[in-house]
Amino acid sequence: MHAMTFAHRILGFAAGALLLAGCGGGNAIAPGQTSLLPPGIARGAHTNRAESWMAPEATGEDLLYVSDADGVVDVFSYPAGKLVGVLKGFASPAGLCSDPDGNVFVTDINNLNVLKYKHGGKKPIQTLVDFGHYPFGCAVDPGTKNLAVANYASTLSFGPGSVSVFVGGKGEPHSYEDQTFNAYFFCGYDSQGNLFVDGADYGSYHTQFAELAKNSSTLTNITLNQTIGYPGGVQWDGKYMAVQDAYTHTIYRFSFSGSSGTSMGAVHIKGDESGLLAQFWIDGKTVVLPYGTQARAVHSVGFWPYTKGGNHSQSFTVAHATELVGVTVSLAKK
């Protein structure tokens, strides 16, 4: 297995790409913008897991987990932002997700697996092997406890990615592919157990969006009525599916009917100048997002009002951060 390289992760596109909705179920990626997955993913840090630590009080607090592509996941009290732990031993941690029990899942791209941690735990309690794929985003269905993983690419000649679903959050995954996708980025379950995933087509000319309906074995392309310049995070917000446009710093809220998605509103995020892809996380009336105040650097975490958007209401800088990628909020059992 060859580790992902910087060149593989450049999702370039022609300057003449059209900003038109929905050819083949996707939207054109905006011209003039070269979006990159975080540079740290190529490094393959392999930090020592034995060096992980967690403050004793962490198990009783709500926690914010933040992945750094250089091989660690920082853990903060939420919403105070006090560092209470650091998880180590990853090659290249990326997308994060959590379940209603407070368990946290960390995709580790170059290790081809997803690690599960108890709320406030410093050692993984489960390793889910995603062999043959580079996992990037993840989501948990609260009803079935199925874990879905958006695989950026396959390890075989760096071929097209896929979606892996670990039924009940264990065992070997079921794999799903869509011929219009090349790279898969993020995914999210709605309240009915339907899975939605975004990504890009061959050459990264268009954003792609698809649904794996509950109990279905086929990904169905979804045509969105709103252009997505560059696909980012996907998460259910309690009413609509929130889909991030990393190019315009906007989170759109979609409802779906058949193979069509209709935007029901937009949340504009101000203050991010990094130009890099990072995952958001919605917690009630707050959306949390890693961001940067200068190009190609994501070293801070901000909280924005959801669904008002605008300027962040709170932020903090992560000490010694290399390139922040994903976030998730894990709630303590009360």
Model regions: which residues?
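Blade-level signature of beta-propeller repeat domains, shared across WD40, Kelch, NHL, RCC1
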Residues: 299-334
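Short loop/turn segments that connect beta-strands within beta-propeller blades
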Residues: 77-81, 117-122, 167-171, 212-217, ...
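Bacterial signal peptide processing site
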Residues: 24-27
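A short beta-strand motif characteristic of beta-propeller blades
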Residues: 41-44, 82-88, 123-129, 171-178, ...
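Short loop/turn segments immediately following the C-termini of beta-strands
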Residues: 68-69, 109, 152-154, 200-202, ...
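An edge-strand/N-cap motif at the start of beta-rich repeat modules
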Residues: 32-86
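Beta-rich, blade/repeat-based domains predominating
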Residues: 40-61, 89-101, 131-146, 150-154, ...
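C-terminal motif of bacterial Sec signal peptides marking the signal peptidase cleavage site
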Residues: 20-22
